[in-house]
Amino acid sequence: MCAERLGQFVTLALVFATLDPARGTDSTNPPEGPQDRGSQQKGRLSLQNTAEIQHCLVNAGDVGCGVFECFENNSCEIQGLHGICMTFLHNAGKFDAQGKSFIKDALRCKAHALRHKFGCISRKCPAIREMVYQLQRECYLKHDLCSAAQENVVVIVEMIHFKDLLLHEPYVDLVNLLLTCGEDVREAVTRSVQAQCEQSWGGLCSILSFCTSNIQRPPTAAPEHQPLADRAQLSRPYHRDTDHHLTANRGAKGERGSKSHLHAHARGGAGGQSAQGPSGSSEWEDEQSEYSDIRR
């Protein structure tokens, strides 16, 4: 639940954070030519950008971050791949042997896949972005991101910066994957992002505080620790039902007892009515009155 909330929150933050920069770009840096203007309006990578990226990919090697730099500053606004690559390389020395192997293999996997898939994809920006992020996820999973994160939790948390989540979608994808890597990794990432969010946005990060409190709270409370108000609310229906059954049982028993008592007196009255005289008639009227009260 908390993982879903955090993922939705950072995605929503990413959307709001990109509104103003996008509006500023349109007003201060208009497209230079009709071709670029039409490409941006249709959501396509311009022919010039396509040629530049293809040329860059041919000259870039599999080692390092050269391939990812080819996707910076394009009309589809695919950014963050180069930054996340540099972040991994700068922190590689802090990882253990398994973590270092993951960084080398994952970056090489992404570079190789981007070079071979880019020429086969449509120039539509949504298709290119989906291809880029899908390849990134596949390479992370193929080379076991979770195992590397579980053995290097502190380093992974240090790599995640809240401002990157607001500006670059590859970081959001990375965090969403880390949130599926077990409770220790998920809790560490959530706390780190929450603390950084509170420094930047203050009270707007209360949703993350609620999420973290849910992680720390036991799933169910013991009966003896339930609030008194809750126990009172729970006990009221029970008492009402119990009182209803007791009243019904008493009424039924009283009715049956009164009937048997009445029949007994009727038989006795038939046998000795002449001997009782006025007192017998008075007792009979009293019993009739009690019987009527019970029936009411």
Swiss-Prot record:
The gene designation is Stc2
Which regions span the lipid bilayer? none
Q: Where is this region: Disordered?
A: 22-44, 236-296
Compositionally biased intervals (Basic and acidic residues): 238-258
Q: In which tissues is it expressed?
A: Expressed in a variety of tissues. Strongly expressed in ovary and to a lesser extent in kidney.
Protein's recorded name: Stanniocalcin-2
Q: Which Pfam families match?
A: Stanniocalcin (PF03298)
Tree of life domain: Eukaryota
List, alphabetically, the InterPro entries matched.
Stanniocalcin
